[in-house]
């Protein structure tokens, strides 16, 4: 199997051009290639496939083999690959995903894509569509008991479920413990990616995220 490894701000995947080859049992392949000790090492596997409704399709699998619906960083890399390797030859493209068709604008310099902007669409806040179990129509700054501690969460979907938790101090957060507890909480039937956010000032936030078995930190 020929592959390309790419990343968007550290969110790395193994990409396979399925215009040229077929991947049998992609769930098993995703588990194998994602292993950072015995495989290639990645957050998952993304297959770039032909599509009847868009310029190409992104078929993604998480590192545990489960199928994913959408990844903003992943789809930007799909767009770069598709242009750089001749699948598309235009700077405005469409990519089919499990969460619908996404539209991307490419910046091309010297024949190669240098930047990609993706229209992720409007955020989904309706609880049943995310999905998150709640008596309320929307979960915005609502309490959730996780491992005996109350966290105030906002639930949103941009193609897959996210829980956003604002905290006063995230430096001492045990993300490897609390991350899986959020991910597998009964309130999230399709599991959840969790972002813990500390506001530093009006221009700066610090985040720690737990995304399907992987923790990472960012600042902006």
Where are these regions (language model features)?
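Extreme N-terminal starter segment of soluble prokaryotic enzymes
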Residues: 1-3
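N-terminal beta-alpha supersecondary unit
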Residues: 5-52, 185-188
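Residue-level signal for inorganic ion chemistry
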Residues: 10, 72, 118, 159, ...
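Conserved phosphate-donor
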Residues: 38-57, 163, 178-210
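Acidic, low-complexity central loop/insert segments
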Residues: 63-153
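Anionic-ligand binding region
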Residues: 140-143, 152-154, 171-186
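Active-site rim beta-loop-alpha module in soluble metabolic enzymes
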Residues: 155-158, 164-172
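Conserved small/polar residues in nucleotide/adenosyl-binding loops
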Residues: 211-218
């Amino acid at each position: 199997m020929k592959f390309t490894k790419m990343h968007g701000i550290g969110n790395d995947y193994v990409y396979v051009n399925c215009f040229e080859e077929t991947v049998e049992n992609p769930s098993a392949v995703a588990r194998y290639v994602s292993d950072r000790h015995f495989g290639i090492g990645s957050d998952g596997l993304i297959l770039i496939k032909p599509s009847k409704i868009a310029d190409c399709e992104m078929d993604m699998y998480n590192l545990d083999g489960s199928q994913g619906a959408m990844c903003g960083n992943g789809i930007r890399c799909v767009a770069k690959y598709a242009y750089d390797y001749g699948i598309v030859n235009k700077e405005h493209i469409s990519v089919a995903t499990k969460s619908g068709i996404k539209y991307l604008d490419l910046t091309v310099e010297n024949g190669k894509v240098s930047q990609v902007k993706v229209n992720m669409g409007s955020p989904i806040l309706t609880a049943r569509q995310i999905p998150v179990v709640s008596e309320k129509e929307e979960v915005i700054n609502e309490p959730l008991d996780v491992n005996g501690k109350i966290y105030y969460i906002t639930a949103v979907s941009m193609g897959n479920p996210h829980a956003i938790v604002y905290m006063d101090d995230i430096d001492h957060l045990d993300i490897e413990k609390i991350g899986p507890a959020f991910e597998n909480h009964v309130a999230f039937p399709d599991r959840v990616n969790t972002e813990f956010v500390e506001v530093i000032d009006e221009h700066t936030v610090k985040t720690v995220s737990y995304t399907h078995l992987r923790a990472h930190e960012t600042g902006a």
